[in-house]
Amino acid sequence: AKDLDAFAKRVARLPLKFQPGSKYHYSIAVDITGLVVQRISGMTFDEYLQDNIFAPLGMKDTFFEVPRSARERFLPNYFFDPESGKPVDISLAPPPLNSRKNVAMQDYASVSLYSGGGGLVSTAMDYARFAEAMRNGGSLNGLRILGPKTVDYISTNHLSAGSGLAGFGEQPGVEAVDSVLGFGLGFGVVTDTTKTDVVGSVGEYN
């Protein structure tokens, strides 16, 4: 899809897996949340993130579309070529891989689909600043982007007892412990370390 509006229209044509509120299944809901932010704020999702999260936290190297001045520091995306057994720069790959446009994970130089669920590129230092702000309850160096109660709420498990991260079967090790990995508002939450192979602490979110 060329942008979030077109993406949401395509998603809306798909049949429901089940009635909303009756079950939990990991989904693309957070992708659609980006469109909700656009509609409420009157800004594009990338503009909203820049003005309300990245700039206040001093995250100068986090973008959907990498500016030309920063591209020499940006590593290209690679895919594994089974024929040669080697990684290949996706920009040098034959069609149809190199012809896909406006896909944030591939075409970082020309992006129009600002997804709520993925596509940002960043640096370890920028991400550390964001993580530290979350660890501090929504603030960094005296600048607040979220209230402490909001951080607590979004990082608390909101699934009913017995529900877990269903839908992650394609990721090794997760399906077996999905009943003890809860989900907040955009974060997976550890609810019981005695029944999981995931190393962590109760209440940990990621």
Each language-model region and where it sits:
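Short, surface-exposed loop or secondary-structure junction motifs
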Residues: 1-196
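Short, intrinsically disordered, charge-balanced linker/junction segments flanking boundaries
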Residues: 1-2, 200-206
